[in-house]
Design a protein with these regions (language model features):
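Short, compositionally biased P/S/T/A/G/V-rich stretches that sit at domain boundaries
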Residues: 20-57
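Aromatic sugar-binding surface patches on proteins
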Residues: 85-93
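Active-site-adjacent pocket scaffolds in enzyme catalytic domains
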Residues: 267-375
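CE4/NodB-like, metal-dependent polysaccharide N-deacetylase domain
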Residues: 153-154, 158-161, 228-273, 372-380
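Acidic (Asp/Glu)-rich catalytic clusters
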Residues: 147-158, 176-201, 206-208, 212-223, ...
Length: 428
């Protein structure tokens, strides 16, 4: 935020004050209580291609009578002189864009003293991107789940949700045309009012698969021997070309219903293979988040869903970070790579973690120290008729924890962002 400051007077007008000393003063053993320094934040986050931060530092100093001038040394930037304000304080507002990540000091000295009257530390950090997502497992999530999401936006003003919406909303015969349009209008409102994203989620329901002109697979379920609805079928059961067909059909359905063209994706049950991700790249998608921190869905241990994810996403864990998958192996970034960013679902879904676990995942990726490079925490939940108040409260509780570290409040490096927007921070 830019504050109105009086510009520095010329040396002549100031009665020939000496130039600022380049050499930093000695830090004081304790800050001098005769000076009151305000407005310096605890955290300043770097800008990048995904987002722009206010990289200005504002300093006000109330000084003892007869103080002639105040100089400041910010990190390793050149010394600068503060301007005297009409109320007698001294102030400066200056860019710290050239200060790299780390913990730094602001040193302030008066009247050319070689000992500073104040040393104030601050943190300069790359952003900690927190991504909140929803997976539409069902054609109609119900009104209560949507109301809960509206409440989350009300409680957390900076929240951005990536809604992985469902193409089967528009092919399930149980959903009336009027209800389809009601759900589409709700998604559009979230995007337009809150800056949310409308991405794509696919469980290969037969009503959707057959509407795309394909034969529905029913014998590769993560839960059942046969699933003639298609819901629990591994998405990887559809090869690269068939997956491309499903994606193009989904895009057509979204565009026809006013949702725009989705650019990001998560597979139902996280069951994406290399062919799945390659098909996404073929279809122009820019990011996928099917790579699962599988150890956190231990509720499914002993079942095919757990086994499949453990085998296919073996190295993905609490602290896995974005990468461009190899054309030969979806788990590595060996060249040549696909033109799609994989952002691991390292925070899993709220269905499978307690609030304490969710907060510990936040801490695993941010230990309170400045980040040298951007990091991501991906989490989400399933909006559905079954979505409970306790699940809502876990999401809300986690967001309260994340809000304590917001970059905009100078309290930490947290920036809420959608999946499509975070891609720019991880350009290949």
């Amino acid at each position: 935020m830019r504050l109105p400051l009086v510009l520095a007077l010329s040396l002549a007008a100031c009665g020939g004050l000496p130039d600022p000393r380049e050499e930093k003063p000695t830090a004081p053993a304790d800050n001098d209580p005769g000076y009151t320094v305000t407005n310096i934040g605890e955290w300043y986050v770097t800008s990048d291609a995904a987002q722009t931060q206010d990289e200005l530092m504002t300093i006000f100093v109330a000084v003892p009578p007869a103080t002639e001038f105040v100089d400041v040394w910010i990190a390793d930037l050149p010394v600068q002189r503060l301007s005297k304000q009409p109320d007698g304080r001294f102030a400066i507002q200056t860019s710290i864009a050239d200060v790299p990540p780390g913990t730094w000091d602001v040193l302030l000295a008066a009247d050319g003293s070689t000992t500073a009257f104040a040393r104030i530390p601050f943190n300069r950090s790359a952003p900690y991107y927190v991504l909140v997502t929803t997976d539409w497992d069902f054609a109609d999530p119900g009104n209560q789940a949507n109301l809960y999401q509206e409440q989350l936006h009300q409680n957390h003003a900076e929240l951005r949700i990536t809604h992985f919406a469902a193409p089967y909303t528009f092919t399930d015969p149980a959903v009336t045309p009027a209800r389809r349009q009601e759900l589409a209008a709700w998604l559009i409102a979230q995007r337009d009012m809150h800056g949310d994203e409308i991405g794509l989620h696919i469980h290969p329901y037969c009503n959707f698969v057959t509407s795309a002109g394909l034969t529905c697979v029913i014998d590769q379920s993560t839960v059942l021997n046969i699933d003639d609805t298609g819901y629990t079928i591994k998405l990887g059961a559809y090869g690269r070309e068939d997956m491309r067909t499903l994606l193009e059909h989904a895009k057509e359905l979204f565009v026809a219903n006013g949702l725009g063209t989705p650019r990001t994706f998560r597979a139902g049950g996280w069951t994406a293979t290399l062919d799945t991700v390659a098909a996404l790249a073929d279809a122009g998608f820019i990011a996928d988040t099917s790579a699962l921190n599988w150890a956190r869905i231990e509720e499914w241990e002993g079942e095919e869903l757990y086994r499949w994810n453990m085998e296919n996403w073996a190295p993905i864990n609490d602290t896995s970070q974005p990468y461009y998958p190899s054309q030969q192996n979806v788990l590595t970034d060996d060249a040549p790579t696909l033109s799609i960013l994989e952002v691991p679902d390292n925070g899993v879904m709220i269905d499978y973690v307690s609030l304490a676990e969710m907060n510990s995942l936040f801490d695993a990726n941010f230990d309170g120290q400045p980040l040298p490079t951007p990091r991501t925490l991906m989490m989400g939940f399933h909006p559905a008729i079954q979505f409970s108040e306790s699940e809502y409260l876990r999401v809300d509780g986690f967001l309260k924890y994340a809000d304590m570290h917001l970059a905009s409040k100078r309290k930490g490096p947290v920036v809420y962002i959608t999946l499509e927007n975070v891609v720019a921070a991880f350009a290949p």
